[in-house]
């Protein structure tokens, strides 16, 4: 029987869903063991006097009986159960909580909106990569949290009384997806936002991160439809028009939208459009974690790392016994190549980061077998938990590793949506060349090289006589030129 003392559980009694997260602490980071989510729709059980109906409470207790079974193996000091907006509001919350505590065998804490916002921010800070200065948006069932911060520190926290369940009951009660219902829902959301908008804008942000079911649903829709993963106002408006075209909630069909998420999708969409409009948000990406992750990391007292992606890469290198010196060597060559062609190819900083990340993991497939190592690498990266990387970025890394050597599978580079297809091709070319020139596994054997780009033509200049002195290297480069030419990537080597 394994020790249970490294297990931690976080339970979030939300207004729309109840969630449970069980993790194990491994070398200063967390490994997810269980995630259970049940749609309880507690907020829908509030009447005009803010009393919870017996049916809604029973739905909640039924869900907690499922959770209780899993909690039996975990020390009570390593369990945190929090309740949010609906139980802050309900006049008979005490009745619900008393029974909930009896079922779970541990305390249930009703947290304030500000504390909820702080925990959400901590969950994002521990699990989401990108710029340090961020705005975090979480649309819950009955409240919406908006938080600005830098690194681990919050600079402003707001919890607003609007959510996808309450807005559904208020503005889409007739289940009609007409323009007038959307207009009313957006107008009301903007009025709720207006008093806090100035302070949020004053603190500012470099990156905006969404941490809710609505944003998760948008991500799933965009992945299913082959769009890039950045959420923009234009995409939100397109989805709204699609919803209006469907006419009624029970007839809402959007490629990638699950039945489970469909009910509260239009109301969440209206709130998100209002947030984008009122705060002039350019684009948003999906967070790696939120409230439950904030609770877990709080219990573990782990510091927020400056660079979550680096922590993730280090942990994976250790776990799969990757040769770190070689990974760094390849990364150094790739970075040098990238810096030489960046201007001509109009590449962005995030592309450089993703190329370096691919270099750090490029030999992960060897931990399975040398034979088909690129396929093993792609499979592992696609299926590993990579905090700090978005789902689309994971897919790009897997695709680059699949194409690190041998003939190029162009269609796979075009199927990812983290970067435009042309950029994926360019990063792939740089990775392949870096692996070749670092293959001797010694810093002093990496030649001084210049790489020039002229549209798609790459010209690589090596030291005089290098090709003559390195017949195997010459053969490998000739083979690489041929493979690149098959997919119309011209490569000249001098």
From Swiss-Prot:
Record EC number: 3.6.1.40
SUPFAM superfamilies associated with the record: Actin-like ATPase domain (SSF53067), HD-domain/PDEase-like (SSF109604)
Catalytic activity: guanosine 3'-diphosphate 5'-triphosphate + H2O = guanosine 3',5'-bis(diphosphate) + phosphate + H(+)
Protein name: Guanosine-5'-triphosphate,3'-diphosphate pyrophosphatase
InterPro entries, A to Z: ATPase_NBD, GppA/Ppx_hydrolase, Guo-5TP_3DP_PyrP, Ppx_GppA_C, Ppx_GppA_N, PyroPPase_GppA_Ppx
Keyword line: Hydrolase
Gene: gppA
One Pfam family this sequence matches: Ppx-GppA_III
A GO molecular-function annotation: guanosine-5'-triphosphate,3'-diphosphate diphosphatase activity
Pathway in which this enzyme or protein is active: Purine metabolism; ppGpp biosynthesis; ppGpp from GTP: step 2/2
Organism this protein belongs to: Shigella sonnei (strain Ss046)
Family: Belongs to the GppA/Ppx family. GppA subfamily.
Family annotation (CDD domains): ASKHA_NBD_EcGppA-like
GO terms (BP aspect): guanosine pentaphosphate catabolic process; guanosine tetraphosphate biosynthetic process; nucleobase-containing small molecule interconversion
Task of the protein: Catalyzes the conversion of pppGpp to ppGpp. Guanosine pentaphosphate (pppGpp) is a cytoplasmic signaling molecule which together with ppGpp controls the 'stringent response', an adaptive process that allows bacteria to respond to amino acid starvation, resulting in the coordinated regulation of numerous cellular activities.
Domain of life: Bacteria
């Amino acid at each position: 029987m394994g020790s249970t003392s490294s297990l931690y559980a976080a339970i979030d009694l939300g207004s729309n869903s109840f969630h449970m997260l069980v993790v194990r602490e491994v070398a200063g980071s967390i490994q997810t063991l269980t995630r259970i989510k049940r749609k309880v729709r507690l907020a829908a059980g509030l009447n005009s006097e803010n009393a919870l109906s017996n049916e809604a409470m029973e739905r909640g207790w039924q869900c907690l009986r499922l959770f209780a079974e899993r909690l039996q193996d975990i020390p009570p000091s390593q369990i945190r159960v929090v309740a949010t907006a609906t139980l802050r509001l309900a006049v008979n919350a005490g009745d619900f909580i008393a029974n909930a505590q009896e079922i779970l065998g541990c305390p249930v804490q009703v947290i304030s909106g500000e504390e909820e916002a702080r925990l959400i921010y901590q969950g994002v800070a521990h699990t989401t990569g990108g710029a340090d200065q961020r705005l975090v948006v979480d649309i819950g069932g009955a409240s919406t949290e908006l938080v600005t911060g830098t690194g681990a520190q919050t600079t402003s926290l707001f919890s607003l009384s609007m959510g996808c369940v309450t807005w559904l009951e208020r503005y889409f009660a007739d289940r009609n997806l007409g323009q007038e219902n959307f207009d009313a829902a957006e107008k009301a959301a903007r009025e709720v936002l207006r008093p806090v908008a100035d302070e949020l804008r004053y603190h500012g942000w470099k990156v905006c991160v969404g941490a809710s079911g609505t944003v998760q649903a948008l991500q799933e829709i965009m992945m299913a439809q082959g769009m890039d993963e950045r959420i923009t106002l234009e995409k939100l408006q397109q989805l709204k028009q699609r919803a209006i075209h469907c006419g009624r909630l029970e007839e809402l069909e959007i490629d990638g939208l699950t039945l489970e998420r469909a009910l509260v999708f239009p109301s969440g969409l209206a709130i998100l459009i209002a947030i984008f409009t009122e705060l002039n948000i350019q684009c948003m990406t999906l967070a790696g974690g939120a409230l439950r992750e904030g609770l877990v990391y709080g219990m573990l007292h782990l510091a927020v790392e400056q660079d979550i992606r680096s922590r993730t890469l280090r942990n994976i290198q250790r776990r799969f016994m990757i040769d770190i010196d070689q990974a760094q060597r390849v990364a150094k060559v790739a970075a040098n190549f990238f810096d030489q062609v960046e201007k001509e190819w109009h590449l962005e900083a995030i592309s450089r980061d993703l190329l370096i990340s691919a270099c750090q993991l490029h030999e992960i497939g060897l931990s399975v077998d040398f034979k088909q190592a690129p396929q093993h690498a792609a499979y592992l990266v696609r299926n590993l938990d990579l905090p700090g990387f978005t789902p689309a970025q994971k897919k790009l890394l897997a695709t680059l590793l699949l194409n690190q050597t041998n003939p190029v599978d162009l269609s796979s580079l075009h199927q990812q949506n983290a970067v435009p297809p042309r950029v994926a091709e360019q990063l792939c070319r740089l990775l392949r060349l870096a692996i070749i020139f670092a293959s001797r596994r010694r810093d002093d054997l990496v030649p001084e090289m210049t790489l020039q780009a002229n549209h798609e033509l790459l010209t690589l200049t090596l030291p005089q006589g290098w090709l003559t002195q390195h017949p195997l290297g010459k053969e490998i480069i000739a083979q690489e030129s041929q493979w690149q030419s098959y997919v119309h990537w011209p490569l000249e080597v001098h």
